[in-house]
Amino acid sequence: MLAVRNMKFGIFLLWWGWVLAAESTVHWPGREVHEPSKKGSRPQRQRRGAHDDAHKQGSPILKRSSDITKSPLTKSEQLLRIDDHDFSMRPGFGGPAIPVGVDVQVESLDSISEVDMDFTMTLYLRHYWKDERLSFPSTNNLSMTFDGRLVKKIWVPDMFFVHSKRSFIHDTTTDNVMLRVQPDGKVLYSLRVTVTAMCNMDFSRFPLDTQTCSLEIESYAYTEDDLMLYWKKGNDSLKTDERISLSQFLIQEFHTTTKLAFYSSTGWYNRLYINFTLRRHIFFFLLQTYFPATLMVMLSWVSFWIDRRAVPARVPLGITTVLTMSTIITGVNASMPRVSYIKAVDIYLWVSFVFVFLSVLEYAAVNYLTTVQERKERKLREKISCTCGLPQPRGVMLDSSYSDGEVNDLGGYMPENGEKPDRMMVQLTLASERGSPQRKSQRGSYVSMRINTHAIDKYSRIIFPAAYILFNLIYWSIFS
């Protein structure tokens, strides 16, 4: 029994000695031993520093793992063998032209500017082609979709918009670019673009005009020998949003065409056209231009019903209508380009201006003839000597252009109601008629002299409206 106990105690001492020996040779992570009284403390620190240096020099325990966000792109590039090919050359270089199909979905037609002669359109532009260099093995025949980062590493068609003034690819929240690759190498390249392009407009029938604009797509570097550009599904390649509308235009039609463009320095290129026809809404211009002009012409006719002696009433009315017509013409031309030909709206406005101006000239003629009439009447009164009691009277008929003073001079006749009559008969007897046999043979006869300049206003009340109505019938039958 005692021997067994001694053996157990010996085993325990051996185990304890082995533990102490292990603690003196093994460094425990995160544990620091401070024994300044011992001489072996400095070598221990040196060994610890050497141990840390070993970790700093590339110990696999502290090696940082690669960025997992970049690993799918790297695997995709390896799967597509991006580094094994030269993508600066087009697919099938040296062979026939590579066919590139295009389809477009118009998202919005933002604005049409007559002054700048351009339009702004936002669209989805999609390209279709086959590049066998991008083919990859796939058991489920699924395509791979990428963003714009891969576009910079492979070959894509170098399309541009002919006659464009400004264009950009949308980048909210990221670049609106998508690349989809099929296992057999077929590629779909789609991007969202806003472009402002030129549109040659003809304003000879403005605002009753119809405009046709085109957005032209073409390869910048590759001629028809290298790249064959075509609409993938014909007219069905162009899709539009049904909600597209413009404030001043009605979109009548969208259609596609394909033509060849020739450049003397480089050759022939395939060019795709997106054509759309716009018809202008006339109601806005009826309210803003035609109706005010017609109203001013009709207002100028009011002067024909005003007494020709009322100069303060007729003159300001004529001047006001002329100035208003000038303002309307100036306002219309300010919103239009300075073209060298006459527009339909110019014809209407200038003819209306002529009618207004003629109404002013009409009153000038009436006023002048009235003044001449008064001068003749004054001379006539001076030649006639008024002698009471002469048996043979001669009648002089005057119209309403006489004044109150003239009535007193001609005998003091005035109706009971106090109003001036349109005509009055003044009985005058010449002294030389009493003893003349020739005058006696003419007793009882009267000579009437009628001077009536008011007839010009009466004729103008009919001629001016009739002529303006005839002009409107001809104008709207031609331009509508």
Swiss-Prot record:
Signal sequence range: 1-21
NCBIfam families from the UniProt entry: LIC
Subcellular location: Postsynaptic cell membrane; Cell membrane
Family, similarity comment: Belongs to the ligand-gated ion channel (TC 1.A.9) family. Gamma-aminobutyric acid receptor (TC 1.A.9.5) subfamily. GABRR1 sub-subfamily.
Function: Rho subunit of the pentameric ligand-gated chloride channels responsible for mediating the effects of gamma-aminobutyric acid (GABA), the major inhibitory neurotransmitter in the brain. Rho-containing GABA-gated chloride channels are a subclass of GABA(A) receptors (GABAARs) entirely composed of rho subunits, where GABA molecules bind at the rho intersubunit interfaces. When activated by GABA, rho-GABAARs selectively allow the flow of chloride anions across the cell membrane down their electrochemical gradient.
PANTHER family linked to this entry: NEUROTRANSMITTER GATED ION CHANNEL
SUPFAM superfamilies in alphabetical order: Neurotransmitter-gated ion-channel transmembrane pore, Nicotinic receptor ligand binding domain-like
Membrane-spanning ranges: 282-302, 315-335, 347-367, 459-479
UniProt topology in membrane: Multi-pass membrane protein
Protein name in UniProt: Gamma-aminobutyric acid receptor subunit rho-1
Compositional bias of kind Basic residues: 39-48
Region feature (Disordered): 31-67
Pfam families: Neur_chan_LBD, Neur_chan_memb
GO biological process, one term: chloride transmembrane transport
Native species: Rattus norvegicus (Rat)
Activity regulation behaviour: Inhibited by TPMPA, a rho-specific antagonist. Inhibited by picrotoxin, when forming a homopentamer. In contrast with other GABAARs, rho-1 GABAAR is not inhibited by bicuculline, when forming a homopentamer. Down-regulated by external protons when forming a homopentamer.
An MF annotation (GO) of this entry: protein domain specific binding
Cytoplasmic side: 303-314, 368-458
Domain remarks: GABAARs subunits share a common topological structure: a peptide sequence made up of a long extracellular N-terminal, four transmembrane domains, intracellular or cytoplasmic domain located between the third and the fourth transmembrane domains.
UniProt superkingdom: Eukaryota
Subunit structure: Three rho subunits (rho-1/GBRR1, rho-2/GBRR2 and rho-3/GBRR3) coassemble either to form functional homopentamers or heteropentamers. Rho-1/GBRR1 subunits can also associate with alpha-1/GBRA1 subunits to form a functional GABAAR. Interacts with SQSTM1.
Residue intervals on the Extracellular side: 22-281, 336-346, 480
Glycosylation sites: N141, N235, N275
Sites where the protein binds 4-aminobutanoate: R126, S190, E218
Key words of the record: Cell membrane, Chloride, Chloride channel, Disulfide bond, Glycoprotein, Ion channel, Ion transport, Membrane, Postsynaptic cell membrane, Signal, Synapse, Transmembrane, Transmembrane helix, Transport
